Amino acid sequence: MSRNSGRIGMGIVVGSLAAVGAAVAQREIMRRAGTRLIDWEAVRQIARRRLGEDAVPIPAAQRQQADAFYRETLLRIEPAVAEEIGAQLPRALEVPAVIDRLEWVDLNLATFQQLFARVEEILAQAQSGPDSPGRALSRIVNRSIGNQQLGFLMAFLARKVLGQYDVSLLAAGPATRGRLNFVEQNIVASAAALRVPLDEFRTFIALHEATHAFEFEAYPWLRDHFARLVSESVEQFATDSGGLLGRLRDALAAGPGAKGHWLERIMSPEQLGSFRRTQALMSVLEGYSNHVMHAAGERLLPGFAQLHERFERRNERRGAVERAIMRITGLDLKMEQYLAGERFVKAVIAERDRGFLNRVWESADRLPTLEEIADPARWVARIEGDEH
């Protein structure tokens, strides 16, 4: 055998081994890639690492004491809120849940996971042609980036959220109940930062979340309507991933001085319509809740006005990093909802009365649009016109 033929033989062997190795590597890439957009356990671990010492559980004695306080407080809050809203609950508010920061992460990741499952299903159906190692590798890279981003966001919010009425949108139905969650460690820390008595601050937060519970429990059609809006938005975004990327590039190229919020600029007209309907509903919910909270709070807490002022002043003093995160994630839109919705509620009550305002809860077509929230007289005229 010549030296060249020996080299060729060795080359064939090496090439064969390389081919086998490449095939195994491709299968491993395909296996690891799966079809998931997010690795939920990885997100949880990322959030936990970022929380660090803040991820410690609540001591059992503190949890028990806080749980008893919220139960008793909600019994006092319920009749006061019912009187202000002008509606009775068909059944009592759910038992409150005192949770720690990591428990809050777990609860919200469960909701995200259900939403993403539908997105993954739509994307899998839309994929043309067989899967390939290139596509699989792309999914792995994108999933890793998504894991980091979502883990960061969950850790950030887990330190900020005080109370949350979990409306159970993804299990909407006549028998579905919401859940009142209180992130006790954040409530204790905020009360200390504001230098207010802990029990007063607990009552303040419980009152705000209870008003949201009233809105959904007293008017059950709201949950189904809200769930449809969320489902509609998820379907639209999932079926338009290519167009979304193009609009995102355009939005980034336009820079920070462009008109409107960056989230709105990356939406198609159809997506923007659903988004604006959701924003309008959220605005009314927040504005109405704040109005009721103020009215009931004055009776339940002697120092309510001062406590509310301190709380709002602290919110206005957010640092540059926090403001940037809120803008990037769209959370700043939620803060705008509070203000616009409350102005709408006050204007309608001033022009008519609370009974007239409560017509927003009669059906979905009675809800105001964003344009009507900005100009309450338009909504008043439309509702009165419907009656003639």
Predicted regions and their residues:
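Hydrophobic alpha-helical topogenic segments used for membrane insertion/localization
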Residues: S5-E28
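N-terminal mature-domain "stem" immediately C-terminal to a signal peptide or N-terminal signal-anchor/transmembrane
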Residues: I29-E84
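Acidic, low-complexity proline/glycine-rich segments
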Residues: R32-I46, Q164-V183, D250-G257
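Auxiliary, metal-adjacent structural segments of Zn-dependent hydrolase domains
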Residues: T73-Q185
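Post-HExxH zinc-binding segment in Zn-dependent metallohydrolases
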Residues: N147, G151-Y165, E215-L301
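Short pre-active-site segment immediately N-terminal to the catalytic Zn-binding motif
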Residues: I187-I205
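Active-site recognition of the HExxH zinc-binding catalytic motif
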Residues: F201-P220, V345
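Pan-zinc metallopeptidase signature
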Residues: G273-H388
